[in-house]
């Protein structure tokens, strides 16, 4: 029997739940909210997902949860819920970087060349973003640097934002439009893709 994994994402305004049977997603639900209401949405979403798949909690092999960066309250809700399920079912908890999940959204628009560099950006409020650069290996994204919190404004040096070089950069995440706007045309030739991390 293949691994059955419950995936949770609560690091942004978007709250999502997905169930995987091996590599196949058998159920996914996402809600985007104006204000964080994950505490009231998450458990009903998990229950609905399990019912839709015909699974019980005891059928789960592991729970995967976004470990940040992101909203402190959202991360706390997701992590606490995941830990509770893992403890009750005696199954492992898998922590996943929220920015890495955002990087994978690039694959939704088409194939990516091996060696392509993607900058994942997440809104940290005001003129700040969380960011991390990744390189596509053909099978996965490999981190090129650590997660950073940056203030982005019109005078921001592109090298500080994207230390691996700026030619043909792909910027993806819920702060892609904000980053493009704040750079005020300094990022010509870059591709910006707005996306929320999802389970």
Q: Which residue ranges define each predicted feature?
A:
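Residues at secondary-structure transition points
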Residues: 33-41, 72, 76, 80, ...
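Short amphipathic alpha-helical face segments that pack within enzyme cores
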Residues: 41-45, 80, 84, 101
